[in-house]
């Protein structure tokens, strides 16, 4: 990523300054008005906007929460550790994480040089990307369908290890740049860029990890464990009883 952009994203925000001065936790009112911790797009997006980027808040633990929008996290440098639906996800430089509205996320404290950027995205922003990726069924499309329709899909997050894929890195940096610097006429440009990003990611599905709800993940783990332990004499009836 361009060093000028890294320097801008690395600047200490007002929220981070308060944390460094001794505040031990996030201020929930910056993110939601609700009792439950559902991060609200209305707190982070200007009226009429479909997408925004903001640097990830460092130096503090971010407790378990969901979002009423789609969050895309890009790791610019360093690492961040996330617990998503009970699974540990460690983002390294160049990694990309998509979370839908059903993903439960917790974030461990990041250091000064751990720079991540969060895309706050309303589902309708992905309409162009959806139309660009065609009719073929795949987990990327399933994720989009669930996000666009608000369905409680099994695929609630997608994690891409794409640091070495130059076209992907260029497309992400282009979106961060145009949104962060508020370049004019950017909406259609960024919607098409997101579509191009998805088309590129379809070429690298071998670099993707997908995760569902914690309950589904645990069930699948138990199924695999049962098959491994009883691969000769196991039956579906016995498996059903164990489940």
Model regions and ranges:
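Amphipathic alpha-helical segments enriched in hydrophobic/aromatic residues interleaved with Lys/Arg
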Residues: 4, 8, 12-13, 136-193
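Short acidic-glycine-tyrosine-enriched beta hairpin
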Residues: 86-101, 109-111, 115
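Short hydrophobic beta-strand segments that form the core of ligand-binding sensory/regulatory domains
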Residues: 71, 81, 96, 106, ...
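Ligand-binding loop in jelly-roll beta-barrel domains
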Residues: 102-133
């Amino acid at each position: 990523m361009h060093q000028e952009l890294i320097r801008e994203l690395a600047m200490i925000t007002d929220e981070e300054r308060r944390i460094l001065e001794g505040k031990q936790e996030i201020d929930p009112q910056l993110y939601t008005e609700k009792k439950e911790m559902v991060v609200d797009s209305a707190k982070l997006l200007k009226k009429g906007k479909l997408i925004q980027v903001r640097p990830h808040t460092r130096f503090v633990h971010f407790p378990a929460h969901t979002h009423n929008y789609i969050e895309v996290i890009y790791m610019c440098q360093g690492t961040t550790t996330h617990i998503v639906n009970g699974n540990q996800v460690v983002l390294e430089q160049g990694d990309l994480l998509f979370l839908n509205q059903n993903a439960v996320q917790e974030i461990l404290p990041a250091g000064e040089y751990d720079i991540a950027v969060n895309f706050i995205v309303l589902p309708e922003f992905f309409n162009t990307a959806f139309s660009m990726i065609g009719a073929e069924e795949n987990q990327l499309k399933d994720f989009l369908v669930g996000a666009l329709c608000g369905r409680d899909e099994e695929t609630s997050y997608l994690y891409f290890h794409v640091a070495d894929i130059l076209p992907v890195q260029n497309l992400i940096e282009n979106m961060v740049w145009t949104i962060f610097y508020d370049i004019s006429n950017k909406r259609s440009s960024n919607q098409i860029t997101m579509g191009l990003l998805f088309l590129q990611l379809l070429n690298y599905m071998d670099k993707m990890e997908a995760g569902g709800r914690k309950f589904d993940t645990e069930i699948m783990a138990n199924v695999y464990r049962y098959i491994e332990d009883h691969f000769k004499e196991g039956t579906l009836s016995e498996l059903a009883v164990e489940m």
